[in-house]
Amino acid sequence: MLVYLAEYLTRFHTGFNVFSYVTFRAILGLLTALVFSLWFGPKLIERLQLLQIGQVVRNDGPESHFSKRGTPTMGGLLILAAIFISVLLWGDLGSRYVWVMLFVLGSFGLIGFIDDYRKVVRKDTKGLIARWKYILQSLAALLIAFFLYATAANPGETQLVVPFFKDVMPQLGAVFIVLAYFTIVGSSNAVNLTDGLDGLAIMPTVMVAAAFALIAYLSGHAQFANYLHIPHLPGSGELVIVCTAIVGAGLGFLWFNTYPAQVFMGDVGSLSLGAALGTIAVLVRQEILLVIMGGVFVMETLSVILQVGSYKLRGQRIFRMAPIHHHYELKGWPEPRVIVRFWIISIFLVLLGLATLKLR
């Protein structure tokens, strides 16, 4: 929004031209989201406490989690508000990338909100029925996938980038829709499964978003893209604003979500942030790279799939409890140890993912 005001003011003073630089607006976007989260966080937590919107803890969960019962949840509203305000202020509202991301965050955030509302307000422990949650996620993801495929302006927008192989970038054609769908829905649910300990999901989300900010910037510049053998995607630089807004909002939320948490993000936060990471990966053509950098999310998801599959096929469980972070809790690891070690794994995987841009 302010891009247009700055463009007008440039007529009177060339100093306003600095707002045309994506990097400058990205920094302002990060700071805006961070400051908003830190400032409004206590107010939201107080409001949630007054409304008695507290976390529901399963009786069959780890005993250490019983103390979390009643902790304010739906804090993802704070994250979404910070991102929306930041992007609307500093993003180029004429960019297709910006509106796609706002739609993703809004639609998946709404699905998560309905789920949380049913759990904590209507006291329905099951929340939104799993079937309906998946249907709504699928509708939103398919709408995004079809839109991106129909509006692709150059061949690079529907290529598949394969890490470590600089000349392997096959054209996907209509298969793009299928890949985009599974990436968005899968990422959304993976982050949701990871969000089981204080700060466990938000920090890897921040790390992956920061990495995608760099990738989006490189993809938007022809020279960098050609040098790294990745698709040149004109205009993708605007995704940097979205990514840094996620980073700022995430760090601000972590201030209150770190152990022992004062607030949880709830499904309204985890489903929307996961879908956002998946959509960014689709937009910059780095779906495989998301699997690497988001390895913690993948590990959590696979642990659930393996646990359920093993129990149904063999009648035996592989882990003491799934997702896998609960397994380590039941082994006696203190919660902060599980969290920090998963963060360390995430740092390693993000750096490995970034290294693949050059190791081709």
From Swiss-Prot:
Q: What class of enzyme is it?
A: transferase
Query: What GO biological process terms are annotated to this protein in UniProt?
Result: cell division; cell wall organization; peptidoglycan biosynthetic process; regulation of cell shape
From the UniProt record, give the pathway where this protein acts. Cell wall biogenesis; peptidoglycan biosynthesis
- What EC number(s) does this enzyme carry? 2.7.8.13
Keywords for the protein's UniProt record, in alphabetical order: Cell cycle, Cell division, Cell inner membrane, Cell membrane, Cell shape, Cell wall biogenesis/degradation, Magnesium, Membrane, Metal-binding, Peptidoglycan synthesis, Transferase, Transmembrane, Transmembrane helix
| Membrane topology term | Multi-pass membrane protein
Per its UniProt entry, which superkingdom is the organism in? Answer: Bacteria
Needed cofactors: Mg(2+)
What residues form the membrane-spanning segments? Answer: 26-46, 74-94, 97-117, 134-154, 168-188, 199-219, 236-256, 263-283, 288-308, 338-358
What is any one of the record's Gene Ontology cellular component terms?
Answer: plasma membrane
The catalytic activity, as recorded, is:
UDP-N-acetyl-alpha-D-muramoyl-L-alanyl-gamma-D-glutamyl-meso-2,6-diaminopimeloyl-D-alanyl-D-alanine + di-trans,octa-cis-undecaprenyl phosphate = di-trans,octa-cis-undecaprenyl diphospho-N-acetyl-alpha-D-muramoyl-L-alanyl-D-glutamyl-meso-2,6-diaminopimeloyl-D-alanyl-D-alanine + UMP
Q: Where in the cell is it found?
A: Cell inner membrane
A GO term, aspect molecular function: metal ion binding
Q: What does this protein do?
A: Catalyzes the initial step of the lipid cycle reactions in the biosynthesis of the cell wall peptidoglycan: transfers peptidoglycan precursor phospho-MurNAc-pentapeptide from UDP-MurNAc-pentapeptide onto the lipid carrier undecaprenyl phosphate, yielding undecaprenyl-pyrophosphoryl-MurNAc-pentapeptide, known as lipid I.
The family annotation for this protein states:
Belongs to the glycosyltransferase 4 family. MraY subfamily.
**Mind telling me what this protein is named?**
Phospho-N-acetylmuramoyl-pentapeptide-transferase
UniProt organism field: Shewanella baltica (strain OS155 / ATCC BAA-1091)
Q: Which gene encodes it?
A: mraY
